[in-house]
Amino acid sequence: MPTINQLIRKERKAVLKRKKTPALQACPQRRGVCTRVYTTTPKKPNSALRKVARVRLTNGIEVTAYIPGEGHNLQEHSVVMIRGGRVKDLPGVRYHIVRGTLDTAGVQDRRQGRSKYGAKRPK
């Protein structure tokens, strides 16, 4: 516990909260170019081949982003939009690619939760 004199000499410093999505720089979404599209395996109790992409953003930062939904059309040099939102079982993946914008197609034959996957209303 500091004395009054110590507090006068040097005031208390507020603890800074760590940002969950630093690469977005307080923007809701950001545009970027895919540098590598690949699959990776999740952490321990789960087993799958999760689709992810390395994305170089317009601000120069390179991040790993998850590609949600079944099937995708992304490849190297695809222009994508990313949003915040981590994938719990993939360490280091803190961003999601927005489906149905720029070069990313929406999910085919999606009937429920369509707005999250950029799918048009079925006829």
From Swiss-Prot:
GO MF annotations in UniProt: rRNA binding; structural constituent of ribosome; tRNA binding
Keyword terms, alphabetized: Methylation, Ribonucleoprotein, Ribosomal protein, RNA-binding, rRNA-binding, tRNA-binding
Residues that span the membrane, as ranges: none
UniProt-annotated stretches for the region Disordered: 104-123
Amino acid composition bias (Basic residues), ranges on this chain: 113-123
Example of a GO cellular component annotation carried by this entry: small ribosomal subunit
Entry-linked Pfam families: Ribosom_S12_S23
Modified residues (3-methylthioaspartic acid): D89
InterPro entries: NA-bd_OB-fold, Ribosomal_uS12, Ribosomal_uS12_bac
Gene3D superfamilies tied to this protein: Nucleic acid-binding proteins (2.40.50.140)
SUPFAM superfamilies (alphabetical): Nucleic acid-binding proteins (SSF50249)
GO biological process: translation
Subunit structure of this chain's protein: Part of the 30S ribosomal subunit. Contacts proteins S8 and S17. May interact with IF1 in the 30S initiation complex.
Function description: With S4 and S5 plays an important role in translational accuracy.
HAMAP family according to UniProt: Ribosomal_uS12_B
NCBIfam families per UniProt: rpsL_bact (TIGR00981)
Family as reported in the entry's similarity comment: Belongs to the universal ribosomal protein uS12 family.
Protein name (Swiss-Prot/TrEMBL): Small ribosomal subunit protein uS12
